Amino acid sequence: MYPQGRHPAPHQPGQPGFKFTVAESCDRIKDEFQFLQAQYHSLKVEYDKLANEKTEMQRHYVMYYEMSYGLNIEMHKQTEIAKRLNTILAQIMPFLSQEHQQQVAQAVERAKQVTMTELNAIIGQQQLQAQHLSHATHGPPVQLPPHPSGLQPPGIPPVTGSSSGLLALGALGSQAHLTVKDEKNHHELDHRERESSANNSVSPSESLRASEKHRGSADYSMEAKKRKAEEKDSLSRYDSDGDKSDDLVVDVSNEDPATPRVSPAHSPPENGLDKARSLKKDAPTSPASVASSSSTPSSKTKDLGHNDKSSTPGLKSNTPTPRNDAPTPGTSTTPGLRSMPGKPPGMDPIGIMASALRTPISITSSYAAPFAMMSHHEMNGSLTSPGAYAGLHNIPPQMSAAAAAAAAAYGRSPMVSFGAVGFDPHPPMRATGLPSSLASIPGGKPAYSFHVSADGQMQPVPFPHDALAGPGIPRHARQINTLSHGEVVCAVTISNPTRHVYTGGKGCVKIWDISQPGSKSPISQLDCLNRDNYIRSCKLLPDGRTLIVGGEASTLTIWDLASPTPRIKAELTSSAPACYALAISPDAKVCFSCCSDGNIAVWDLHNQTLVRQFQGHTDGASCIDISHDGTKLWTGGLDNTVRSWDLREGRQLQQHDFTSQIFSLGYCPTGEWLAVGMESSNVEVLHHTKPDKYQLHLHESCVLSLKFAYCGKWFVSTGKDNLLNAWRTPYGASIFQSKESSSVLSCDISADDKYIVTGSGDKKATVYEVIY
């Protein structure tokens, strides 16, 4: 009955064999269970040991690959230097006298004849020096195991004979140190040059740049400066005059003060490539690799500044210091209120591991477990039309082993294949360290909506059967009109009843009558602020007779729309150099403005006076919304916080800390839920009292604007990735998605939830009809 090797049953003398009492049978079963439990424990210990060894092997593999790749690059570099020096010598030698020419020629020939003995001696000396340096700075060097089975990693040429000494990793400590230093210099160079490019402007975001200075200043190597100059030269080859206005709102990595408004030609980012970040690194090699860079907003705000000599604010760099110190996905400093860690710094468009390998080794431990990289062209198992998202950014199967290993160790997306340009820097599981079991739901389809519990546990959301159906839930949206504003459209709003659309651009607001199909020209133009200053926000009072406009100036303009021709009724002047967002109280008596200095100004519209300032944000306040009953205000800032304010008592109620800058937010008209758009490309839906939340991952870049439908059942978000996404409240089932030709900077929904208007970086606004 029992196999051999099991514990024998206790046998009492005086009784026939195999006749047990119930108690003896229970004892036997207990012994068997304890035996199995001991076996299970030993197997589990063995499994954990093997898992740790596997993780360590993956880290070693990537480190080995990094060394090999670095040496390969260095070899090609030195070869090219030698060729150029030879050319120079050949050009100079004819100027020498005949005898000197012969002497120099002989010396050159002798220099070329390096014997293996000399080479080995040189290598040994270099290794000794490197080991001394490693011991002095980082302790004993890390020794890597040989590649398993003696095989070379894919893409690495085999190393032979004495040259194998080049791959000795005794200097790994110093190599890692140099890697960190190079990365730091590269980021700081970006920050320094961006700041210098904005110094010529009357910058309303001096305080914004000030927050950048804490990231440290160091001496920049000549090599880093040279790389930056080469990047600019390469970008200038693809300049397009038609795109010059785009970078006024969207940062296109053109930091040359002499040419502040030139941006490369753009096309839709079919591969989901994060252009802004790739441009911040090494210069691209083709126009395709800088596609859509002109529709790339800076990471400082939802485009709170521009590289323009006009009075436009300067921004934080689009390559922020990576915040990889988050212990778990979604960690925040407030218990129970967690957010995704920031995206890793820029990724090169070349299909090799250069960018990923530039990351310091020390940050890999959090992301040791490999996880599934998958597309999210379908929702969490319930999308009715998968074709709607087809081609968003699928990862082809020919992913190389080295790239996959690097992705596992670094928590980054693997490159598609060596030499390929396109890859997705923001898959659903980007850099979160989530186990692969969370990458999909039981149906096997990729997940993009996750529920985050109070303790930070993330689980894919199983959508209810009525997620995409039911009263008040749209089926899709149809584009019905394009309003050619002529400048980048940073602000839009729709009148109630739905007839007029207001688009804010550079120095003016244009009014469009959308009740007449095919209308191609505005019915009125409201010139406000200065001619070169951008409108950031425009809000209608509930009666539709008054429009309030704010932007890159210290004044808010109040327009009387009821007069025969619109006229300026009043101007409100604040101490802040810019206003980034506006909100109106439901009773239309008070206006709230988000200031570039972080304060929230409260204005009495009847007396046209400043009555209060909410102080708390340590950096610019970028977005704002007010509760339906007018008792609570929500604000988001570039200090990575979302704050709520009690308007009756005039005090701060809550603060939610994140690891990413906040670019947009919206409060559900029916209460309870607050949706927040991040620089990290996530949308997070928070409950106003409970600590758990939802995290949505369909955007591939910064989420620049967000608006709830008036019914509260759905909301839309727009981003630097050219996408307009519609989500179900609160769990984020994707209702529909529309892709535009440039960054979508602003959006609004009509009061009857039948129309959506978006403003984009290609100087137009788009009107959508919502189909139910």
UniProtKB/Swiss-Prot annotation:
Tissue expression notes: Placenta and lung.
GO biological process: animal organ morphogenesis; negative regulation of canonical Wnt signaling pathway; negative regulation of cold-induced thermogenesis; signal transduction; Wnt signaling pathway
PTM remark: Ubiquitinated by XIAP/BIRC4. This ubiquitination does not affect its stability, nuclear localization, or capacity to tetramerize but inhibits its interaction with TCF7L2/TCF4. Ubiquitinated at Lys-720 by UBR5 in response to Wnt signaling, leading to substrate recognition by the segregase p97/VCP and degradation by the proteasome.
Residue list for modification Phosphoserine: S203, S207, S211, S217, S240, S245, S263, S267, S286, S317, S413
Entry GO CC: beta-catenin-TCF complex; nucleoplasm; nucleus; transcription regulator complex
Region annotation (CcN domain) ranges: 200-268
Family per similarity comment: Belongs to the WD repeat Groucho/TLE family.
The protein's name in its UniProt record: Transducin-like enhancer protein 3
Organism: Homo sapiens
